[in-house]
Amino acid sequence: MSRVDKNGLAIETVLHDFLVEEVLPGLAVDADKFFADFSAIVHDLAPKNCALLAKRDELQVKIDDWYRRHGAPADMDEYQSFLREIGYLLPEGSDFQVSTQNVDPEIASIAGPQLVVPVMNARYALNAANARWGSLYDALYGTDAIPESDGAEKGKSYNPKRGEKVIAWVRDFLDTSAPLQDCRWKDVGSFAVKDGALVVRSIDGEQAMLTDGKHFAGYRGDAAAPTHILLKNNGIHIEIVIDAATTIGKADPAHISDVWLESAITTIMDCEDSIAAVDAEDKVVVYRNWLGLMKGDLQEEVAKGGTSFIRTLNPDLQYAGPDGAAFEVHRRSLMLVRNVGHLMISPAILDRDGNEVPEGIMDAAITGLIALYDIGPSGRRKNSRTGSMYVVKPKMHGPEEVAFAVEIFSRVEDALGLPRNTIKMGIMDEERRTTVNLKECIRAARERVVFINTGFLDRTGDEIHTSMEAGPMIRKGDMRQAAWISAYENWNVDIGLECGLAGHAQIGKGMWAMPDLMAAMLEQKIAHPKAGANTAWVPSPTAATLHATHYHRVNVARVQQGLKDRARAKLSDILSVPVAVRPNWTPEEIQRELDNNAQGILGYVVRWVDQGVGCSKVPDINNVGLMEDRATLRISAQHMANWLHHKVVTEAQIIETMRRMAAVVDRQNASDPAYQPMAGNFDDSIAFQAALDLVLKGREQPNGYTEPVLHRRRLELKAKHTA
């Protein structure tokens, strides 16, 4: 492969040419200065990056040794004393309040769903950006949120019986979200706007008003017969679409043809766990899509029902306010970008000594450069109206690593001529050392932080790896009931509120991983806003629309205010180790656990390694489709490695299980023409060997991360195909 030397950086030609030909020409940034500054950042900060990773390993060695001598901690005071002694658990400083400035309301004050989407896939990225609004009728009709009983089957064509149930559900929702005086929404016959108020006439001819006139936010069309009514509740919008020409509208007394909800308020465009980018060629795909999003010209041809069309970013729409004055409603999700963490290095660029550069530094510099199309001196200001860039930084271990990310961002700002603290930071609370030192982590980024989020999946993977030597872990399905989990979730909210995040930043909760089970999500995920989270992750635009209903039912700002006086969750609970005290699992239970873990690992890894797909819906052992990414992979691999280490299972048992479940995964992928079967090809299947590595060498992986194995095996496969 060819490289271009720029100030001591040997950049792969495909990446260099992308920067020089596609990114830099549209910006008021001198190319030579950019590369000189980029090189200085890499050469100054890469040694610090390496030192922080070495510290992770040093701490793990000490913790492993302690567990070998003591087992799972019985005396929590003694355990905490040890963690303080080695510098794992740090002293907590005085109280403070974050001081982040120029934060868009989508993050600072609007509570609502958040999508995480692989930015490597242009279609998914566009769908997510456009998921700021979604049809509640469609979301209910097309999912199991409405049961298919009593003749309400989905079918291949429109089922009026099902439609009636959807409409009834939505009318009940409107009765609680924007109630009318002396009238139910099911009895509405017409709308008009008079004297700055929404006037409703019932099918009986009676006039009614909104119980709270502040719920009326605007309209489109003629005031006497509007085509769109905009309502607002708890800071987020509802749009009622009136159109008698449609099948639904014609049959409706008020000609309501649809009800749309403001849905994915924010979206994380992901360069990390949901993608498979292992070389310069892959990274250019990532960066090119981010460029299209920042320039506003990303497009993708989409084939549907025998025809195709070009999907682009939705434009904002003009509405008339209650007073008749025009205003604009945002129709795109506010975009954050998730860079990779501090661990990985990339072959896309080599430093002056021939070392691969830290990928997190590369991401910060290049995604930051591209963001100038939105926030630079001549930026569009179509993503961030306040001129901020939002970077989610994952997998950081403790405040020293957060401070290092702050230093990277500062250096990038200087290189790009941006004011200090333009680049905001989202802190993923997904590593144990960050959790227990969360207040100090936030302090390290107090002028930049816009987001803290519990990542149950990665956090469980780190929990298992950190305490690998303590004993065999409880079964994976029992982990959600472990003492540390609820304490961790509450602690994140408690610390966030203590540090003044309310009204300034997001306090987030994790992913609903079952995209087909929307009825269950509607029932259960309301727990997130009730717990004080003003955002939570959803797996699809449809899920975002359904989850948005929870933010109409729960006033998160009020919940947060009520939680400020709650006693902080206990550190001792967070530090409790989820080992099985007296494991008495039957052979059948052990095998079922192995089967379930192996199936998830293989189903995800085979598509990652063979096809470069970083996020997959993988059927579990009960045939429930689960969203799998590297975080879920980390749990499953570490869990199997833990049981192997503590002799709950044998290596032979794991290999037999993997081989048997490979055949199951092969059958599940039989309809995919690009799929390469693993069964009968175990020695030559690079994907199967990667899955085995993740388990059999799980204890050796840094903090239990899966990226080193996946990247190595994917590069091996790509090299094999180009040989």
UniProtKB/Swiss-Prot annotation:
GO terms for cellular component: cytosol. One of its GO terms (molecular function) is magnesium ion binding. Acetyl-CoA binds at residues 116, 123-124, 274, 311, 539. The modification Cysteine sulfenic acid (-SOH) is found at residue 615. It is found in: Cytoplasm. Pfam families: MS_C, MS_N, MS_TIM-barrel, MSG_insertion. Keywords: Cytoplasm, Glyoxylate bypass, Magnesium, Metal-binding, Oxidation, Transferase, Tricarboxylic acid cycle. It catalyses: glyoxylate + acetyl-CoA + H2O = (S)-malate + CoA + H(+). InterPro entries: Malate_synth_C_sf, Malate_synth_sf, Malate_synthase_TIM, Malate_synthG, MS_C, MS_N, MS_N_TIM-barrel_dom, MSG_insertion. GO terms for biological process: glyoxylate catabolic process; glyoxylate cycle; tricarboxylic acid cycle. The active site is at 338 (proton acceptor), 629 (proton donor). It comes from the Bacteria. Pathway: Carbohydrate metabolism; glyoxylate cycle; (S)-malate from isocitrate: step 2/2. Glyoxylate binds at residues 338, 430, 455-458. Mg(2+) binds at residues 430, 458. Its cofactor is Mg(2+). Its EC number is 2.3.3.9. Involved in the glycolate utilization. Catalyzes the condensation and subsequent hydrolysis of acetyl-coenzyme A (acetyl-CoA) and glyoxylate to form malate and CoA. HAMAP family: Malate_synth_G. Monomer. Belongs to the malate synthase family. GlcB subfamily. This is Malate synthase G. It comes from Rhizobium johnstonii (strain DSM 114642 / LMG 32736 / 3841). The lineage of its organism: Bacteria, Pseudomonadati, Pseudomonadota, Alphaproteobacteria, Hyphomicrobiales. The gene is glcB.
